[in-house]
């Protein structure tokens, strides 16, 4: 009899526990009133109450509830909820802060990182576009947008942004190898292995100490094993005398038209005046607008392609070039342009006090 009575009692207790749990599931602990203004303003209601109550999160929420545009508090709050994995919520809060309180480019940059982490690539692109509207000459914004495009598998858009980073970075030695590797990987993904190799060589050439870099050599060997570059891609060798000046002027032929160019290892592209581009029949009808960082400040350019660039016996085909749409002599009197890395990186280039040489990579 005792056993028979014990079984219903156990069932009653079990049912009571289950009913209690169900009731708890339906009952939502309210957000504390003292932090609710900030939680509502910055759309943080999806965070667990236990997380909102953590001292390092509650403290900035209290400050933001009193002063909605407290930048220090928002910076601390975003960092804390980031650390807990609330990347989407952090991005939304940062963007909402900027919308409400005014320009804060650092917050938008952090929001891009959060959105990329949350795989919201189009959202990240949209925020990067806002930053570029504020400052179209900041390389970091193009790099961030390129990463978002790459995540969205919009490879050509990503590549265009990565190349824009180089165009805005006159000191390539300070540019991270990560950028060049991304450029190379995108070229390789499209089957352009010669261009992939050139991208890594451009990074190597930026600093003589990188000549024996094992990682760079390994990447070059890997890409080179996929396809042999055609002779027209880069061929020949030449050696030239140097005058006393640090500036090296050469006679180069673009699409068969001769011009005077300055050898500029810091220029990302072969750059030419609009007048010379017209003589050389460079088609700019479908050219993409880019921005270049030069010794004289930022400039606009039209990114096109030359069928051939020839320097003595050295020649390359299908070379990206930038056309300067400015005045008649943007590079100085008698100078038609700059011979930059879109040509030079295809070759081994070395400089000595009295001579300099250029030759096809072995």
Where are these regions (language model features)?
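Bacterial N-terminal signal peptides that target proteins for export
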Residues: 2-12
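Bacterial N-terminal signal peptides
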Residues: 12-21
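Pepsin/retropepsin-fold aspartyl endopeptidases
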Residues: 24-362
């Amino acid at each position: 009899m005792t056993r028979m009575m014990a079984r219903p009692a156990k069932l009653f207790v079990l049912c009571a526990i289950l009913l209690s749990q169900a009731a708890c599931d339906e009952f939502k602990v309210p957000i504390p009133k003292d932090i609710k203004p900030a939680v509502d303003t910055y759309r943080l209601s999806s965070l667990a109450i236990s997380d909102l109550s953590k001292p390092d999160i509650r403290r900035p929420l209290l400050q933001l509830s009193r002063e909605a545009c407290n930048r220090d508090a928002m910076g601390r709050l975003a960092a804390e909820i980031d650390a807990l994995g609330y990347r989407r919520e952090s991005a939304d809060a940062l963007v909402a802060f900027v919308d409400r309180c005014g320009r804060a480019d650092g917050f938008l940059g952090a929001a891009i990182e959060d959105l990329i982490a949350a795989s919201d690539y189009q959202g990240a692109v949209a925020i990067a576009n806002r930053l570029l509207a504020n400052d179209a000459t900041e390389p970091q914004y193009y790099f961030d947008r390129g990463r978002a495009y790459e995540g969205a598998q919009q490879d050509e858009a990503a590549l265009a942004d990565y190349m824009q980073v180089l165009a805005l970075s006159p000191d390539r030695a300070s540019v991270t190898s990560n950028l060049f590797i991304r450029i190379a990987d995108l070229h390789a993904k499209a089957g352009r292995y010669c261009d992939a190799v050139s991208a890594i060589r451009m990074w190597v050439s930026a600093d003589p100490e990188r000549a024996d870099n094992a990682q760079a050599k390994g990447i070059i060997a890997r890409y080179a094993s996929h396809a042999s570059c055609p002779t027209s891609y880069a061929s020949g060798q030449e050696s030239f005398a140097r005058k006393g000046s640090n500036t090296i002027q050469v006679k180069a032929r673009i699409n068969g038209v001769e011009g005077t160019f300055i050898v500029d290892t810091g220029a990302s592209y072969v750059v030419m005046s609009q007048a010379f581009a017209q003589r050389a029949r460079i088609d700019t009808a479908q050219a993409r607008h880019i921005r270049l960082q030069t010794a004289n400040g930022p400039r606009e350019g039209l990114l096109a392609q030359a069928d051939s660039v020839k320097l003595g016996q050295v020649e390359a085909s299908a070379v990206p070039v930038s056309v300067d749409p400015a005045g008649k002599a943007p590079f100085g009197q008698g100078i038609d342009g700059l011979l930059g890395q879109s040509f030079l990186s295809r070759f081994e280039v070395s400089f000595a006090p009295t001579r300099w040489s250029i030759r096809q990579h072995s």
